[in-house]
Amino acid sequence: MKKDIHPDYHPVVFQDAGTGHQFLTKSTATSDRTVAWEDGNEYPLIVVDVTSESHPFWTGAQRVMDTAGRVEKFNQRYGALARRKKNK
């Protein structure tokens, strides 16, 4: 590999925001926040919304998605158009 053209690939701790589960892996992502890991070293901490610990596919649990707001937004945007076509 050529020197100085690849991003810095280093150990990083990712934390699930919902469950608090943490795992250590390698990434090019960086963060100002750090956390002490089990091996006694400090690693950058990156908090993510969803991991395999909280994703419905991996947990088998269903989550209800808030679609009411999306439906209202759609009706506000396109509802008048549908009413005009219906009145013709």
From Swiss-Prot:
Gene3D superfamilies tied to this protein: Ribosomal protein L31
The UniProt record lists the keyword Ribonucleoprotein: yes
The keyword Ribonucleoprotein belongs to this UniProt entry's keyword annotation: yes
A GO molecular function held by the record: structural constituent of ribosome
Family annotation (InterPro entries): Ribosomal_bL28/bL31-like_sf, Ribosomal_bL31, Ribosomal_bL31_B, Ribosomal_bL31_sf
GO terms for cellular component: ribonucleoprotein complex; ribosome
Keyword annotations: Ribonucleoprotein, Ribosomal protein
GO biological process, one term: translation
Entries under SUPFAM superfamilies matching the protein: L28p-like (SSF143800)
Assembly: Part of the 50S ribosomal subunit.
Record-stated family: Belongs to the bacterial ribosomal protein bL31 family. Type B subfamily.
The protein, known as: Large ribosomal subunit protein bL31B
Species for this entry: Corynebacterium diphtheriae (strain ATCC 700971 / NCTC 13129 / Biotype gravis)
Organism lineage string: Bacteria, Bacillati, Actinomycetota, Actinomycetes, Mycobacteriales
Gene assigned in the entry: rpmE2
